[in-house]
Amino acid sequence: MTPTHNFAFCVATSISFSCLLTAAELPKHIAHEAMWQDRGNISALNLTYGQGGEQHQPSGPFTFVKEDSSGTSPKFEIVDQQGTRWKAKVGEEARAETAAAHLLWAAGYFTDEDYYVAELTVANLPKLARGNQMVTAGGVVHGVRLERHMSGQEKGGTWTWARNPLQGTKEFAGLRVMMALMNNWDLKTINNVIYKTGKEKGLTYAVSDLGATFGKTGNPLVRSKSNLKDYQSTKFIQHVRQEDVDFHLNSRPFFLTVFDLPNYITRTRMQGVVKHVSRAHAGWLGGLLGGLSHEQIRDCFRSAGYSDVEVEGFAVAVEGRIAELTKL
């Protein structure tokens, strides 16, 4: 086998109404190993608040705890007067991640309790190593996604798209489709978390970082996050066959960047996450999401701080993708 063929082989294998239900009113039973939970009547869900519901929305005052240097987005931890800890994220991922978490929750998947706050005052806030441009006098931080630390929940490691206990189920296939629907181009294993929840420590599988969504997928020179124009310009379904379907998700770098072989292989494998998805399973998700109203979908983006024009644009684009799924 020639070096070129050998390399190719390596790569190849490699909403808001008072009658709406909040998260606290939903069934609490979780199977021992799960990534999806039946939300009941999806048309009655309140997508303004997502997983945490209205009762868990943040309320100050807040005090700085420490800065978090992980990942690419500026983050820091704060605590409210009730002692609840929150992780604050600022930058271009803040709005996209909030909207994505609320939409994913509505589809039945486990997510973090994410809220978007346009302006947040934090006591004892020092000069930040990252994101200090989002801070003004008096410790006022602008454009913040707050992730609530959930009591009784522990992280139990990570899971991979290639190997996990939910493979082959319609729920796992649906999650793969959701990643394509939201244009999530950052499907690294480190973003997939296993949570131990409740007294019996049942395991729930979740995608914990959804910031690289609602933009354009592609190589580092063209991909984007939280960009309406880019999101509207991309296609959703790539190929439809008798039994399965491929979705668009471009993540692989230029071939000329192959000197970073591990990254090249990792990004190539990410594209495979949304390929060869069962048509029946993708159609199941489409039927589920088809129960959402235009106003519910708008609430996903309104709750994330987008402008009226952006809210309408994103909602229409998402509805278009749902319509494509229902035709499978």
Predicted regions and their residues:
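Sec/Tat-exported extracytoplasmic proteins
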Residues: 80-82, 107-108, 179-185, 322-326
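Extracytoplasmic/periplasmic, Sec-exported soluble proteins
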Residues: 70, 92-96, 166-173, 184-185, ...
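N-terminal secretory signal peptides that target proteins for export/translocation
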Residues: 1-5
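C-terminal catalytic region of ATP-dependent kinase domains
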Residues: 199-328
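Residue-level detector of family-conserved "landmark" positions at structurally sensitive sites
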Residues: 114-115, 192, 311
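Conserved ATP-binding subdomain of kinase catalytic cores across diverse folds
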Residues: 49-161
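Regulatory N- and C-terminal appendages and interdomain linkers associated
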Residues: 8-15, 19-66, 80, 289-328
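Conserved kinase catalytic-core segment
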Residues: 96-97, 102, 154-234
